[in-house]
Amino acid sequence: MKKIEFELHYQAQKALHACIDKANRYFQHQFPMPLLSYQLRGKAAGKAYLQLNQIRLNPILFKENKTAFLEEVIPHEVAHLLTYQLYGRVKPHGAEWQSIMQGVFLLPANTTHQFAVASVQGKTFQYRCQCREFPLTIRRHNKVLRNEASYTCQKCRQTLIFTGIQLS
């Protein structure tokens, strides 16, 4: 387990088991229990690894949004795994996934979360051209530093220059 308290992990496992139990009853089928991991970074709340039957949760967002994770994010990701196991490769938030969210879990088929992401935002760096300033992510900033990429303003077509300022 990565950076997650035992009690929170226990609650996540309980929610996961409840989702699989609901699906087993609904479809009259025995679905394998997914593996739960907390190795997701960035702004994503959760991610389903279909062929591994694994769900990865963002531990920082989970700690900040416990109830929403237990009631919405975990069922959302379980629905992806169930969709894959029942229908194979289909659109990630297509009709099959929506029917599982609404029919099995009785939840709205929301495709994105509305969590505050400031705590997982990552570093940004200020770049400028002739007409304005741009925040670049650490990934893009590092590519510029290694001469692997350069970025151009769409408006004035000038190459962006690092100002020396780290924004966050």
Curated annotation (Swiss-Prot):
GO terms for molecular function: zinc ion binding. Its main location: cytoplasm. GO terms for biological process: response to stress. It comes from Vibrio vulnificus (strain YJ016). It comes from the Bacteria. Keywords: Cytoplasm, Metal-binding, Zinc. Its cofactor is Zn(2+). The active site is at residue 77. Binds 1 zinc ion. Residues 17-161 form the SprT-like domain. One of its GO terms (cellular component) is cytoplasm. Belongs to the SprT family. It is found in: Cytoplasm. This is Protein SprT. Zn(2+) binds at residues 76, 80.
